[in-house]
Amino acid sequence: MKTVLWVIAGLIAVVALGVLVLYIGGSRLPREHRSQLTVTLRASRAAVWTALTDYAAMPQWWPAVKAVRMGQMPDGTELTFNMDKHGQEIPFRTVESRPNEKLVRMIANDQLPFGGTWSYELADAENGGTRLTLTEDGFINPPVFRAMAKWFLGLDTTQRDYLQHLEQHLAEKK
């Protein structure tokens, strides 16, 4: 019985030490981050723009979003509520919209442990394609989450997943 208690105490100590290391390490990382990726898509700017702004269709091609609900802020600004695969609704609002050129979307909830903007910049590419640059200017408040994102998950993992599924979606539409 004493051996079992020592093993349990040892496991608890290892987990606590791991969390402490993540907390201290995360506290030393910057709260803000920037991640930028560029892809060339085999679709016109208009087709890419439609895919980016047809929020209701997003769950059909991006598995990270299970549902989208439309809404409005008190000032009339359009909101979308994206339900993620964990059932959490995250509100987004459009900060800037220049059709076929630039779209900036922002998380519209300052109570979340993370936030920021995604900026989409579209430019002509060879053969009628589109060069899409996706920039995340974000922040992560909890130091443990910051460390996990930086060291284990990757700060650009969601962007990479999004762009991969967007590219597949546009290829299927041809």
Question: Which role does the model predict for each range below?
Answer:
Residues T40, T50, H86, F114, ...:
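Extracytoplasmic/periplasmic, Sec-exported soluble proteins
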Residues T40, Q60, R69-T117, E126-R131, ...:
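Glycine-rich portal/gate segments that line the openings of hydrophobic small-molecule binding cavities
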Residues T38-T40, E121-A123, T133-D137:
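Residue-level recognition of well-ordered beta-strand positions that form the cores
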Residues A56, E89, F139:
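Short alpha-helical
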Residues V4-V7, V14-M73:
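Hydrophobic ligand-binding cavity/cleft-lining segments
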Residues T3-L20, R131, D137-K174:
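A conserved amphipathic terminal alpha-helix motif
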